[in-house]
């Protein structure tokens, strides 16, 4: 079955795997999803990711991160810009929850967090927010 919103599929798979206490989850590969995974590793929301090329199709295996009490490191992950209603922000992007969480943006300079976009003075499409 074709997926119309691959970013929503990406964050839903991560959220569901975390809620089910799975150690890993597999996501169909795209360069954007690989860049998102790299960013989530840098910010400490997931342990690691591996791109696996199989005979049928490539995918990304994400190793999820949990707290000492066994709760997922990702408390909340929500899609902001959707196919039916795109959401763009300029260089004056506000902090998410006063800086506790992050907005992830797709910009002309690649996938960035809200803090990085403010520092570089650029805006972009707000893909999702994460806490």
From Swiss-Prot:
Any one cellular-component term (Gene Ontology): ribosome
Protein role: One of the primary rRNA binding proteins, it binds directly to 16S rRNA central domain where it helps coordinate assembly of the platform of the 30S subunit.
Subunit text: Part of the 30S ribosomal subunit. Contacts proteins S5 and S12.
GO biological process, one term: translation
Family named by the database record: Belongs to the universal ribosomal protein uS8 family.
Keywords: Ribonucleoprotein, Ribosomal protein, RNA-binding, rRNA-binding
Protein's name in the database: Small ribosomal subunit protein uS8
GO terms for MF: rRNA binding; structural constituent of ribosome
Listed InterPro entries: Ribosomal_uS8, Ribosomal_uS8_CS, Ribosomal_uS8_sf
Organism from which the protein derives: Chlorobium phaeobacteroides (strain BS1)
HAMAP family cross-referenced by the UniProt entry: Ribosomal_uS8_B (MF_01302_B)
Name of encoding gene: rpsH
UniProt cross-references to PANTHER family, sorted A to Z: 40S RIBOSOMAL PROTEIN S15A
